[in-house]
Amino acid sequence: QIKAWLDQYGLRVSGTHTGLAGLTDDVLEETIAYHKAIGCENIIIPFEKLENKAAVDAFIDRVNVLQPRLAKEGITLHYHNHDHEFKPNEDGLIPEEEILSRTSINLEVDTYWVFAADKDPVAFLKEHKDRISVIHLKDGIGGHEGKSLGLGKAPVLQVRETAIALGMEMVVESEGLEPTGLEE
């Protein structure tokens, strides 16, 4: 039914945020079937705590099982970052570095969270361009305080220019509603 509605309005689903609970062995076939039914070729894991070595290892092990399984079905697996992946966890690991070095998962880079972690989002996009096909373009003033585009401190114009130059799709995400969320 969803596919018919998408077709009726000329829409496509570029990706879904599907947590690991939707990618366990007991529901994986159903998740794959759903994505095929709606014509969606991208599954993005939207968040994992990764608070210690055990959590990082378990996540990486699961990703390394899921990725080839999904690829056989024509589905690409991605991970959506936040700022905590760029900071040492309770065991001193930097989860983003572990993900990059121990998997080949694609990245859906939330450029604001890279900025909020005191990293350069433009440099990150350039350095990992072969693993990034889509970004979240978002603004904020640091920490967990988002703003409407152009009202924060993140380098959104430079990020946008870089993403265009590198052929990356952009999801424009607003954490603020100034002036109304629709007008921005």
Label for each model-derived stretch:
Residues 39, 90, 96-109, 115-184:
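Histidine-acidic metal/acid-base catalytic patches
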Residues 1-7, 144:
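Glycine-rich, proline-tolerant flexible connector loops at the mouths of alpha/beta enzymes
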Residues 1, 21, 48, 112, ...:
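Flexible loop residues that form catalytic
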Residues 5, 12-15, 20-107, 116:
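Active-site acidic/histidine proton-transfer and metal-coordination neighborhood
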Residues 5-7, 34, 126, 162:
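A general structural signal for stabilizing positions within well-ordered secondary structure
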Residues 7, 71, 164, 168:
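Short polybasic/polar patches that bind polyanions
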